[in-house]
Amino acid sequence: ANGVIVVTTKKGRVGRPIVSYNLSTTFRQRPAYSDRAINVMNSAERIRFSRDLVAQHYQFPTDMNLVGYEGLLTKLYNHELSDEQFAREVEQLETLNTDWFDLLTQNTVSHSHTVSISGGSSEANYYASIGYTRDNDVIWDDNNERYTAALNLNTNLTHWMRASLSVKGNVSSRRYYQQDLSPMQYAYNTTRALPAFDENGEYFYFLKRKPGGMEPQYFNYNILNELENSSYDQRGSGLSITANLQFNLTSWLNASAI
């Protein structure tokens, strides 16, 4: 899509100094399983669905992460669980209902502040401002901070020469997650019959299969741990200075130099 960017330059005003403050806020609401647009099975429904697949002798994909009911069933077949242990752990999973949206997203308020001062006389005027913006995404610990400053000066050096100076600077920092983690997609697609924490309140890790490769390889995985230790931190800054001289040589001839 085509777009137009409009850049507006603030100029000082004639008169005594005027100080102004602007505040803007934005509220973002996180998704929830109760939202009408989200239709995801709860733990009991997911376990029932898995049981139906097993009863129909469904062949699960070989590259599938064996978690939830399928993971317990594999342990039962491998004699790692007794029938009683299997039944007890399945019953626990049926009431688990892990709220991935609550763990991975949050309601956020973003805010932007600007303080400016302007003033001057018929011979010279000024405008100065400082600003701060904090933009918070609904994804856990995904945010953007930006500090800005600007100064514009205009003065009549003589009746035929005018000078102006513009200084603008900014400092920004951004924290965001690795794209392959995709917390929102994870919350939509991951079974609620998978715990995020173990019985001791520590992160629960499951064996996740690495994509590709001839031989299957697995690694311990918990998305909360990944988000804590795999974020990107990006910093940047910028400074621009523009000076301009305008010459009114005659009533019909003007010149300028930057």
Question: Can you annotate each of these PLM segments?
Answer:
Residues 1-20, 110-112, 125, 131-133:
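A beta-strand signature from Gram-negative outer-membrane beta-barrel systems
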